[in-house]
Amino acid sequence: MPFSTSDGIRLWTATTGTATGRPAVVILHGGPGLWDDYAVLAAMLDDLVVVHRFDQRGCGRSDPSDVQTLTRSARDIDELRAYFGHERIVVIGHSFGATLAMTYAASYGDHVAGVVYLGGVGVGDWRTAYDEERARRITPEQDARLQELSGRQRTPAEETEFRALSWFTDHADRERAMEWAYASAAVDLPINFAANRALGATGRLTPDEQKAQAAAIRAPVTFVHGAGDPRPAWAVRDLADHVPNHTFHLIPGAGHSPWLEQPERVREVLRAAVMEPK
């Protein structure tokens, strides 16, 4: 069902679940510049709460938008909340969506019942450790092919290959990593690289600013991180330590999308997170 923001951008949305009196859930996708692909997470919660998903402005099935800031994206979430008639919501953000979830919780705290920070990057120099682990997981031949594809126009088949080579290192299970990466890569939606660059440039807080933002959040925050995610868990723990009301769950044998490798454990954690807020 389409929804239009106050500045006229139509957002693709999907709603599932059961109205039970608990705060509804809004799932925030990653990227930035990708799209919602989280029906599997919604299905884990559908018997407990209403779950809303959407493609962020300029992304996936939503309208194009030249306005790409975390402030505007957080406002979009709150406009969606009001449109669907919820006083308070639980926001579940994955990857970049985790950063957006924290921004929303810090900016619209009166409307936040809880936050799930799923597979985020945390605080500090996470990039060095990430690059080192990614280099360990990719062969020289694969890396050379990725670099060759990244520097030119790509056919549809090459675009799928480019995405798979970019994403397969995110998974802890090395035997199934490429299979999962190709499944995500084959989605017939364009990556919004302009949004990726813009949000990367405008959304960067200093470590001290991130910690101050985290300290200002009063809602319970559930941090969930795959032990096999190349993004280091210590950076997420460091951020979590600055949130007054938080829990931290490190999922063994799981990578950046831990529900693929450890679905039952992720289901257990997510259900606990949405059942806690009153």
State each model region's role.
Residues 7-63:
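Conserved HGGG/HGGXW glycine-rich cap/lid loop of the alpha/beta-hydrolase fold
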Residues 52-96, 268:
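Active-site loop/oxyanion-hole signature of alpha/beta-hydrolase fold enzymes
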Residues 87-130:
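Conserved hydrolase catalytic core segment
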Residues 115-152:
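Flexible "cap/lid" loop of the alpha/beta hydrolase fold
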Residues 150-199:
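Conserved alpha/beta-hydrolase catalytic His-Asp/Glu region
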Residues 217, 223-225:
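Short beta-strand/loop motif that positions the catalytic acidic residue
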Residues 230-235:
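Conserved alpha/beta-hydrolase "acid-adjacent" motif
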Residues 246-278:
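Catalytic active-site module of serine/aspartate enzymes centered on a nucleophile-bearing elbow/loop
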